Amino acid sequence: MVKKNDLFVDVSSHNGYDITGILEQMGTTNTIIKISESTTYLNPCLSAQVEQSNPIGFYHFARFGGDVAEAEREAQFFLDNVPMQVKYLVLDYEDDPSGDAQANTNACLRFMQMIADAGYKPIYYSYKPFTHDNVDYQQILAQFPNSLWIAGYGLNDGTANFEYFPSMDGIRWWQYSSNPFDKNIVLLDDEEDDKPKTAGTWKQDSKGWWFRRNNGSFPYNKWEKIGGVWYYFDSKGYCLTSEWLKDNEKWYYLKDNGAMATGWVLVGSEWYYMDDSGAMVTGWVKYKNNWYYMTNERGNMVSNEFIKSGKGWYFMNTNGELADNPSFTKEPDGLITVA
């Protein structure tokens, strides 16, 4: 069992057969050890690393991208090679995503569900930018609350500087440094309930969905986080769905399941981008090394047209990406086609 502020090291074959030195430097014997990768690779140092430490969990480096069937095969390969009973098994998802974030999310959820069905607590490991670009992590939290292990190094000087904490909902563990090895800190006690902070039950009637807390009260005219996901409840206590909300001069979008949208969201035929807090972004957005422009008036993404920004004119491709060329200091005359 680990408690808040406990430390641990995650190791793989990269750390070699003898990990006693790094455990001494870290001042702990707690480890999470890599077992497998894809459906063929096994860590050759696993047995030695287990013998020298106190494993609190094991991890699998995923290669399944957005393929649910492959995720099932990888999960089974992982489970078949767990060497001892532990509480946590980790999905390391940081490479080879598909271009479809929902497909990636579905594959991750299937992998984690197989872990849960086998009697373990599933954990999702990755980096914040990678996760935001490739996975809807709120869906993961809705199914597995407080299940995130997120890497964010800041200055990467070997210390846990919370000025650089990768703020996200549902983080259980933080990998705060890779210098000179992977260092981690526990943020939630093992015994802390994995269920939502506000315990209760969703209810539905002819007017919509509402949430009844265990004490009999219900949220209204407010945001409420339930199962790691933000929802907004109107003056009568009903959850807003498929609807825009203006709150403190910022616009938010509540998806068809009521969850607050983050990242890219398609509303009707228009694309919008919501920041980590859920607020709609206007102006320039950089995403996966490409630039997009969201109108200041409505926030929708511009595509297949010129926009004026500052002193320049820019052309946005049909997919919304900024064209490499041309940029203009004055509005172009006539029709210009950009391949």
Curated annotation (Swiss-Prot):
InterPro entries: Cell_wall/Cho-bd_repeat, Glyco_hydro_25, Glyco_hydro_25_AS, Glyco_hydro_fam25_subgr, Glycoside_hydrolase_SF. Changing D182A: Almost complete loss of activity. Gene3D superfamilies: Cholin Binding, Glycosidases, Multimodular pneumococcal cell wall endolysin, domain 3. The keyword Hydrolase applies. It catalyses: Hydrolysis of (1->4)-beta-linkages between N-acetylmuramic acid and N-acetyl-D-glucosamine residues in a peptidoglycan and between N-acetyl-D-glucosamine residues in chitodextrins. SMART domains: Glyco_25. Changing E37A: 95% loss of activity. SUPFAM superfamilies: (Trans)glycosidases (SSF51445), Cell wall binding repeat (SSF69360). PROSITE patterns: CW (PS51170), GLYCOSYL_HYDROL_F25_1 (PS00953), GLYCOSYL_HYDROL_F25_2 (PS51904). Cell wall-binding repeats lie at residues 200-219, 220-239, 241-260, 261-280, 281-300, 303-322. GO terms for molecular function: lysozyme activity. Its EC number is 3.2.1.17. It comes from the Viruses. The keyword Cell membrane does not apply. Responsible for the separation of the host daughter cells at the end of cell division and participates in the liberation of progeny bacteriophage into the medium. Strictly depends on the presence of choline-containing cell walls for activity. Belongs to the glycosyl hydrolase 25 family. The C-terminal domain comprising the repeats is involved in choline binding. This is Lysozyme. The lineage of its organism: Viruses, Duplodnaviria, Heunggongvirae, Uroviricota, Caudoviricetes.
